[in-house]
A protein has these predicted regions:
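Iron-sulfur cluster-binding electron-transfer modules in prokaryotic oxidoreductases
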Residues: 1-184
Length: 184
């Protein structure tokens, strides 16, 4: 992904074709392909479109909804609340994704509240680059910081994106779990 973002398209093409072949090999073997990070997983659907890749890499919630009947049901009366801050790429490129998380957490007896936040400001490598750091911090302060600092915030807060979790840890010293960590 970084090769593509930074314009190294020739190198990206080589890596993408090699990776696509490996993914297709796993898919042909019948292995469910699940990517943890939404940004990278969705790269296989967009930036890899020219590779001829046949295998489909699912977001965790897409796969979990296929086995929803095998998940344990939550205990009535013990319902708790968890907040989700979704990766901006996930919200825009896989709009059903957030609803799928809600379905999964509901099945587990957990009320999922999706916080209405924009980009955390990290945007992959963007926020790590010195020249972009001030803008990255400004973007974070626009929605993520206030959402995390809400005075009534007592619930667990999760974030789907690795870059988002990294940004929160960098800016506020808080380690947010991925939704899979909250489920386990």
């Amino acid at each position: 992904k970084a090769l593509h973002v930074h314009g190294y398209l020739g190198a990206f093409e080589k890596v993408a074709r090699r990776t696509a072949a490996a993914i297709d090999g796993l898919a042909e073997a019948g292995v469910p392909l699940v990517g943890i990070d939404p940004s990278m997983t969705l790269t296989f659907r967009s930036e890899y479109s020219g590779t001829g890749m046949k295998g489909r890499v699912l977001l965790p919630q897409e796969w979990l909804t296929t086995i929803l009947d095998r998940l344990p049901s939550g205990a009535v009366g013990q319902r708790r609340r968890i907040h989700l801050m979704a990766h901006c790429t996930e919200r825009t490129n896989a709009p059903a994704a957030v609803g799928q998380w809600k379905t999964i957490f509901d099945k587990l007896g957990i009320e999922l509240i999706v916080d209405d936040v924009g980009c955390c400001g990290m945007a992959g490598t963007f926020g790590h680059e010195v020249r972009n750091r001030a803008l990255s911090e400004t973007l974070y302060a626009m929605s993520w910081k206030p959402a995390l600092a809400a005075p009534d915030r007592v619930d667990v807060v999760m974030a789907t994106g690795y870059s988002c979790r990294s940004q929160v840890k960098l800016m506020d010293g808080v380690k947010l779990p991925h939704p899979l960590q909250a489920i386990l």
